[in-house]
Amino acid sequence: IARILAGYGLTCVVHWYSCDRHLDRYLDLDSYFTLGPGVFADPAVREVARRAPRGRLLVETDGLSAAQWALGREVPPEETGALLAAMLREAALLRGVSPETMRAEAHAAFCALYGA
């Protein structure tokens, strides 16, 4: 897919990347990446968190059913904010930055991507 996308010159958002191959191809496209609950345990997602350039990571849940699937437990709606904060902290840990820096980088990525 990355090879096909490269021919279009578009800004790409790679949603919930979880493959143990091809990450370099998506990095070469200067893609944005979403991080979901897989950041806690999935080695491929953790590698994205480590290697994506600054300002190219977005944090999301993909909905509560996806969060429940990834975490293997019920996730009530009122836990959504805490889950997003925990994912930001985990990404910060993997990147060797403070949670505040990670939060600012994710916010900057959102604003750059969506023109906010």
Task: Enumerate the predicted regions with their spans.
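Mid-to-C-terminal alpha-helical segments outside catalytic/metal-binding sites
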Residues: 81-116
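Residues at secondary-structure transition points
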Residues: 43, 75-82
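Short acidic/histidine-rich active-site segments
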Residues: 55-77
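Catalytic pocket-lining loop regions of alpha/beta-barrel enzymes
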Residues: 1-58
